Amino acid sequence: MLEKILRSESGNVHYWISNTIRKESLSLFFLHGLTASHDLFVNQIGYFEKDYNVIVWDAPAHGMSRPYRGFSYEKVANDVIKILKENKIDSAVLIGQSMGGYIAQSVIKRFPEYVKAFVSIDSTPFGEKYYSKIDRWILKHIEGMSKLYPDKSLRKAIAKQNTNSKHAYENMYNMLSVYDKDELCHLMAIGYAGFMEDNCNLQINCPTLLLVGEKDNTGKVRQYNKAWSNEINVPITWIRDAAHNSNDDQPEQVNRCIKEFLLGIAE
């Protein structure tokens, strides 16, 4: 994988891409969740890069892509497209975990022609009807609520909430370690509040795969996905013994499900 940097007035965005882009192969863009980094997909990169063009990044305001001024999902969606154009990729399968699914839907909202397919991993849908007033209030006030936790307790709570295995817990905890408490709390605020601002009723016309950990107890993720599944007539694929970071908890299951999906859309 080659490390590259997308440079902009808002900040530098670090990403990693296959050494050679093969025009005949599908391109996969892996989009990690809030407060994580490209390390979330450590168990996907090696599995997929032999057959596909693979891109992973540290999303704007995350990991190595800091500082980043004026985070918004519109900006981030544009950054995704700039990376594709920079590497002469006409379209990609967007694979988004949690916040990464919001980014994918933000791209679909603005640039549907660049999205070959969408894989949602423990994410939730765009759409006004899914979120109650209390849901929106909580998401808009997450910064203040998270500041009530002592620093170390906050990191442990986030890592524990998101995972159901020792290796995934340790990976999540390490990804959180690059932020001080104020930055971590603010990042959660802009991630969730930004989603509420960008949220809209969205029709997704590309092939879609919904993956959800059976033990995902983050917010109402399972409830939202059941409603989403019914709305778009796409069944949920439940990942056994996995929490919110299901691709890290159970990489073999998730990789197999994604591979079967990719083979289906390539036919």
Regions found by a protein language model. Give the residues of each.
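Gly/Ala-rich beta-loop-alpha elbow adjacent to hydrolase catalytic centers
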Residues: 96, 100, 104
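Conserved loop-alpha-helix segment in the C-terminal half of the alpha/beta-hydrolase fold
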Residues: 208-242, 248
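Active-site loop/oxyanion-hole signature of alpha/beta-hydrolase fold enzymes
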Residues: 46, 55-95, 256
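Catalytic active-site module of serine/aspartate enzymes centered on a nucleophile-bearing elbow/loop
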Residues: 233-267
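Flexible "cap/lid" loop of the alpha/beta hydrolase fold
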Residues: 105, 109, 116-146
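Conserved HGGG/HGGXW glycine-rich cap/lid loop of the alpha/beta-hydrolase fold
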Residues: 11-66
